UniProtKB/Swiss-Prot annotation:
InterPro entries the record matches: UPF0060
Provenance organism: Kineococcus radiotolerans (strain ATCC BAA-149 / DSM 14245 / SRS30216)
Coiled coil: none
The protein, known as: UPF0060 membrane protein Krad_3114
Membrane-spanning ranges: 7-27, 33-53, 62-82, 88-108
Key words of the record: Cell membrane, Membrane, Transmembrane, Transmembrane helix
Family of the protein in this entry: Belongs to the UPF0060 family.
Membrane topology classification: Multi-pass membrane protein
Keyword Metal-binding in annotation: no
Primary site of residence: membrane
HAMAP family for this protein: UPF0060 (MF_00010)
GO terms for cellular component: plasma membrane
Length: 111
């Protein structure tokens, strides 16, 4: 059950961080205004709290593993929201990152 909770928290963190960064990008680069930037900053702040909810106690392990989730999530966000079409190297790289997440977070370790 901890693994499912952990995965759900990684998804939440990705939505908050990637979504927040996207909102800031839209506000600044696409000139959509301060409301977009403000919403992005709030989402990015909430992302910081999402990581603290992980069942794993080691900050470095959680953030290192989240980096792999961020890579895959960013490509997925770009495909769904911005119409970006990842190529086979994008997909392969994202899959490698997700395998790394699995190893870093969920490999059996001695107690």
């Amino acid at each position: 059950m901890d693994v499912l909770r952990s995965i759900a928290l990684f998804v939440l963190a990705a939505l908050l961080e990637i979504g927040g960064a996207w909102l800031v990008w839209q506000g600044v680069r696409e000139h959509r205004g301060l409301a977009w930037i403000g919403a992005g900053v709030i989402a990015l702040g909430l992302y910081g709290f999402a990581a603290t909810l992980q069942p794993e106690a080691q900050f470095g392990r959680v953030l290192a593993a989240y980096g792999g989730v961020f890579v895959a999530g960013s490509l997925l966000w770009a495909a769904v929201v911005d119409g970006y079409r990842p190529d086979r190297f994008d997909v392969a790289g994202a899959l490698v990152c997700l395998v790394g997440v699995g190893i870093v977070m969920y490999a059996p370790r001695p107690s």
